[in-house]
Regions:
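Conserved N-terminal beta1-alpha1 strand-loop-helix module at the mouth
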Residues: 1-190, 195-220
Length: 220
């Protein structure tokens, strides 16, 4: 089975169309995250989701349980991807209230740094037990977490993918030029790209989107 592809940080309906036509499996929209240059209102996100012919993913962070439930009811996504300080207890409470998949982003160090595999694996196990359906392994830097364009440690990601019972997406610094190598090295369930296929924040390059999908899915 070929690797799944998620095109994230979508802000324009034409980019949603390109992503779907290129073979992306998931279209991600950042919703109500003020610090993100790709953030959309829930009304804008619903407009974009209406244009999608593939599974939709809401990406948000640091909201209360009630706010998350309300957001899911408004947008009816395939998955809710959480990038903030959410706890396993919040995930467990949310799991009982929504029917969509719940994905949790976990911060990995940049390729130039190291981290405790055991600590990260314990996080995965704790969130999986609480009800997470998938994890997004993304790069954490001093500049932020997610959408940084900084390559994560593939060595650590590969260990987590191998040891996790739950599907893991690889994110962080992926581009059409390195995604095939990343998939071969890490063997993730899926890959998640935003800045690596952009002209500017939130504006996708159609050729890069198409090439990224082709390169990702050609890897055995």
């Amino acid at each position: 089975m070929s690797v799944k592809v998620k095109i994230c940080g979508l802000t324009r309906d034409e980019d949603v169309r390109v992503a779907c036509e290129a073979g992306a499996d998931f279209c991600g929209v950042v919703v109500e995250v003020p610090k993100s240059p790709r953030s959309q209102t829930r009304e804008q996100a619903r407009f974009l989701f209406e244009k999608a012919t593939t599974a939709t993913v809401v990406v948000t962070r640091s909201k209360s349980l009630d706010e998350l439930i309300e957001l899911v009811r408004f947008l009816s996504p395939f998955a809710l991807q959480l990038h903030g300080d959410e706890t396993p207890d919040l995930i467990a409470a949310l799991r009982g209230k929504v029917s969509c998949q719940i994905w949790k982003a976990l911060p990995l160090p940049p390729a130039t740094e190291q981290a405790s595999i055991q600590f990260l694996l314990e996080q995965i196990q704790s969130f999986a037990k609480a009800g997470c359906d998938a994890f997004v392994l993304d790069t954490a830097t001093a500049q932020g977490f997610g959408g940084t364009g900084v390559v994560a440690s593939w060595e650590i990601a590969a260990d987590l993918v191998r040891l996790s019972d739950v599907p893991c997406f690889l994110a962080g610094g992926l581009t059409p030029e390195n995604v095939a190598e990343a998939v071969a090295a890490v063997k993730p369930y899926g890959v998640d790209v935003s800045s690596g296929v952009e002209i500017s924040p939130g504006v996708k390059d159609p050729e890069k989107v198409r090439l990224f999908c082709r390169k990702a899915k050609r890897v055995p």
